[in-house]
Amino acid sequence: RHIFEPTVSYNYRPNPTVLRTKLQPFDAIDAIDKQNVIHYNFENKFQTKERAADGSLSTREIARIIPFFDTDLHTGRLRNAGMRMELRPYGWLGIEGDSMLDAESRHVDTTNLDFYLEKGPVRLAIGQRYVRDESSQLTAEIRWKLTQDLDVKFYERYEFETNDSKEFEVML
């Protein structure tokens, strides 16, 4: 079955009391500016019925796709557009992604795409991260669930622009 769920939200932020040009930039919060935006989400869920091992029927979500866009009420223009998606064609295979388009330049600003396989206690994942004019990264992860409360995880994030490892993580 297909479930369609549109939502609309409003975000208003008045002018900051201190101009951002007078702040020493520390992180993204220092670049916050006035905002008057309506955000539109159009969530689509696709579900199927599957027979469980005991013979009963259960519902499984096979896809969740959410196109969205923002309208700036100050200028009356489209500000951002994008899409988030989660695909589970099989219980053991998943694909997740998101992308953001700059409506003014009509360029893709960011894109993330991950493929993963899960079989029993093991999860293998590979992904791509892209930020326009800044970064193109590959991610890889291996996770093994040893017990209910104990996992082993290896994670690597590699940057193609500079040909080096940006992050390597081992977790227990």
Q: Residue locations for each model-derived region?
A:
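Outer-membrane beta-barrel translocator/pore domains, especially the C-terminal barrels
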Residues: 1-171
